[in-house]
């Protein structure tokens, strides 16, 4: 008997073919395996076919991800041996490209073994680890189709590459010091200071001296410095133009990390996972300079994920700040020449290598929210693995996402391929980067969209781009309301097929009525939605300025409550400015209405005198989250009239609360009570939580606790971010409803 199999999934570049080869040999089966653009095809014949099928799925390599298996039985054709055939490049692009994966333990042992030929070699990898997504130029995933094509393997590497019993069998980035990429160190003037081990040692010495070094990694450059050196960290802030936004810190090991932070068991597992994300963890007080994460209880911590990181940290006694190599709000730098031009104004030295990065890919960020890992940024280690839809699409869809924390998606059948993190598409550089990344992903999959979907906001650069693209290609353009897309995203990733109550809370999103939404209760299914409840709208004095200045939102709420008398409150404005802002508010000049819960967090933070200006998105909310005390059980009053949730009594209670330290807890408890109250009124069992506010751990935990004990099923995000980084999935899901 013969069996013909077709496997779709992330099975290329993970040691899958050698695994199948060894399994077939062990079971005395004959036939072949081949990589194709559709995935992997296998034909085997012999006696132990059922055992083969069972073990194929149970014992597959750790990184292999099987999306689907189809097989059929046939007559034997008389194969005499089992072989690995040459790959085919024709056909449609169905293969799942694997993300870049952190260095495995076996490779690490070799890097630090003085007797090994790869001792201290920064580009050591195998089929279980190393770069994938950032080096592949086209499918199928074979060495000539990667940026490793310029490095001809030496005899020893070639022998490993061709040996089906070796873990480097068909490891496309396989290399060693003799034949592979090398590192080079330059000063900011572009003069070469050293290469190889000397380059690394000079870079390490510079870090010890308090200098800043740009280091080329897997998906772009990092800017690194001694994380315990306050002066170095402050210098990096000034040069990078990053006032207070937290820096990530890389530790050499979990053991070292525990001297500075308190990870839970789940957070430890996330830190050590093959994806190696940055994980937001509670820090040990005063263990690191306050300037790393000013005013916050958590730090973004991560472990090394490339041999180069491990080598650098092995020769340092301290953790390092490792932040993206760019100016604030610009795309991460990935090319050597660009680094020498751009990063020389930030870094004192630049450590490059000569393996080209095909596409930039930032570090991923994860936070445990409500006891579940939530992706704050889905990028390296996760992208571009697809998310499965509950239904099949009839058309090929391109979704352009939102403006902030942008990701986009291409989708067909039941698969949504979400891009790596693009960033905030607010300037020319990020828009250009967005466009390059869209065309790159479409080209990689030979994808021609038949429908484009975007956000409804007329001023989003991604919306304007989608309009231009749809006209140029003469294909339909669909616009989806921002908060509906948030809830659709949560529904799609959880495989929900029926109606839900969606609670979409965030900073801002363009509403159907032309106002800014952000405190929404929506009854949703894939075909349509209804806005059933929302927070009472208030004016954002000065529009965009109010988003960056919580004191303006606080003033707006006080004016709603007290009218002109609010000007007599002790407010962080001079009298002249106050009177001008009152005029602007009363006449509605550049002061759009908003129902945003994110802005309510800003206002409360300002009313408490904690924060009047936000230096980065979500800063006030993060501070209030850190001040939450689970021992505080009570909440403030609120009222619901018609469809409107009135926050005015809540704000009055806050103003009269003499226990100021309990205000953040009582405010968060109030929001959870409102969620329960509305859920009961609507009466739909399934409740989806989405939007940037749902990154708040105590808030989500409290909402889940309240709703679950009252019989509701609560769904949150795990596969895509709850912030605008998950919008593109919701935009794709919207197309399901149309068909």
Model segments located where?
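Intrinsically disordered, low-complexity, mixed-charge
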Residues: 1-173, 177-184
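Conserved phosphate-binding catalytic cores of ATP/NTP-utilizing and phosphoryl-transfer enzymes
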Residues: 258-263, 311, 332-339, 363-364, ...
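Conserved phosphate-binding/catalytic loops in two-lobed NTP-binding clefts
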Residues: 455, 474-486, 703-727
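Glycine-rich phosphate-binding/hydrolytic loop that grips phosphoryl groups
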Residues: 483-505, 509-511, 550-559, 665-669, ...
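Short glycine-rich phosphate-binding loop at a beta-alpha junction
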Residues: 214, 446-458, 684-695
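Internal gly/pro-rich beta-alpha loop/helix module
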Residues: 317-391, 590-594
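A phosphate-binding glycine/aspartate-rich beta-alpha loop in the early core of alpha/beta enzymes
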Residues: 212, 220-283
């Amino acid at each position: 008997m013969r069996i013909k199999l077709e496997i779709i999934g992330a099975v290329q570049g993970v040691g899958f073919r050698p695994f199948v080869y060894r399994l077939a040999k062990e079971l005395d089966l004959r036939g072949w395996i081949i990589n194709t653009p559709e995935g992997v095809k296998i034909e085997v014949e012999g006696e132990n076919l059922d055992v083969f099928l069972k073990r194929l799925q149970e014992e597959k390599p750790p990184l292999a991800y099987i999306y689907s298996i189809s097989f059929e039985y046939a007559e034997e054709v008389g194969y005499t041996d089992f072989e690995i055939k040459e790959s085919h490049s024709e056909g449609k692009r169905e293969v799942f490209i694997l993300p870049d994966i952190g260095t495995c333990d076996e490779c690490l042992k070799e890097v630090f073994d003085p007797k090994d030929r790869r001792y201290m070699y920064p580009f050591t990898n195998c089929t279980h680890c190393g770069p994938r997504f950032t080096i592949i130029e086209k499918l199928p995933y074979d060495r000539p189709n990667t940026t490793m094509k310029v490095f001809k393997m030496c005899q020893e590497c070639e022998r490993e590459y061709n040996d089906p019993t070796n873990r480097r069998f068909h490891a496309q980035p396989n290399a060693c010091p003799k034949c592979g990429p090398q590192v080079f160190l330059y000063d900011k003037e572009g003069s070469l200071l050293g290469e190889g081990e000397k380059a690394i040692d000079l870079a390490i010495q510079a870090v010890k001296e308090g200098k800043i070094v740009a280091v080329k990694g897997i998906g772009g450059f990092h800017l690194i410095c001694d994380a315990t050196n306050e002066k170095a960290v402050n210098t990096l802030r000034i040069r990078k133009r990053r006032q207070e936004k937290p820096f990530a810190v890389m530790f050499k090991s979990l053991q070292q990390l525990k001297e500075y932070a308190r990870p839970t068991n789940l957070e430890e597992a996330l830190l050590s996972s093959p994806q190696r994300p940055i994980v937001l963890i509670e820090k040990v007080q005063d263990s690191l300079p306050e300037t790393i994460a000013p005013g916050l209880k958590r730090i973004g911590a991560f472990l090394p994920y490339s041999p180069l990181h491990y080598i650098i940290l092995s020769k340092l006694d301290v953790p390092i700040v490792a932040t993206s190599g760019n100016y604030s709000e610009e795309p991460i730098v990935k090319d050597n020449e660009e680094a020498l031009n751009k990063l020389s104004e930030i870094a004192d030295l630049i450590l490059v290598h000569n393996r080209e990065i095909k596409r930039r890919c930032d570090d991923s960020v994860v936070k445990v929210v409500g006891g579940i890992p939530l992706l704050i940024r889905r990028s390296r280690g996760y992208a571009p693995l697809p998310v499965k839809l509950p239904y099949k699409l009839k058309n090929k869809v391109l979704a352009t996402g939102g403006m902030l924390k942008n990701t986009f998606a291409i989708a067909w059948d039941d698969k949504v391929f979400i891009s790596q993190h693009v960033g905030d598409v607010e300037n020319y550089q990020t828009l250009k980067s967005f466009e390059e990344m869209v065309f790159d992903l479409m080209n990689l999959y030979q994808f021609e969209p038949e429908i484009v979907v975007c956000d409804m906001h007329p001023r989003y650069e991604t919306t304007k781009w989608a309009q231009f693209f749809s006209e140029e290609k003469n294909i339909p353009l669909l616009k989806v309301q921002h908060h509906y897309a948030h809830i659709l995203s949560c529904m799609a990733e959880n495989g929900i097929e029926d109606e839900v109550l969606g609670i979409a809370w965030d900073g801002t999103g363009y509403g159907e009525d032309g106002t800014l939404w952000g405190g929404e209760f929506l009854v949703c299914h894939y075909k349509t939605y209804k806005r059933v409840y929302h927070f009472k709208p208030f004016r954002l004095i000065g529009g965009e300025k109010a988003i960056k200045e919580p004191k303006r939102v606080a003033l707006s709420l006080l004016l709603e409550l007290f009218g002109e008398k609010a000007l007599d409150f002790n407010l962080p404005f001079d009298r002249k400015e106050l009177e001008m802002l009152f005029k602007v508010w009363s006449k509605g000049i550049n002061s759009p209405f908003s129902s945003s819960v994110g802005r309510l967090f800003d206002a409360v933070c300002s009313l408490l005198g904690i924060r009047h200006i936000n230096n980065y998105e979500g800063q006030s909310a993060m501070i209030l989250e850190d001040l939450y005390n689970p021992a505080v059980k009570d909440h403030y009053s609120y009222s619901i009239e018609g469809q409107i949730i009135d926050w005015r009594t809540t704000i009055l209670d806050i103003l009269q609360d003499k226990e100021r330290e309990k205000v953040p807890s009582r405010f968060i408890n109030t929001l959870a009570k409102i969620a329960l109250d509305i859920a009961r009124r609507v009466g739909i069992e399934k409740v989806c939580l989405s939007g940037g506010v749902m990154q708040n751990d105590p808030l989500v935990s409290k909402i889940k606790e309240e709703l679950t004990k009252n019989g509701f099923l609560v769904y949150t995000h795990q596969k895509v971010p709850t912030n605008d980084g998950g919008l593109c999935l919701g935009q794709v899901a919207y197309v399901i409803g149309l068909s």
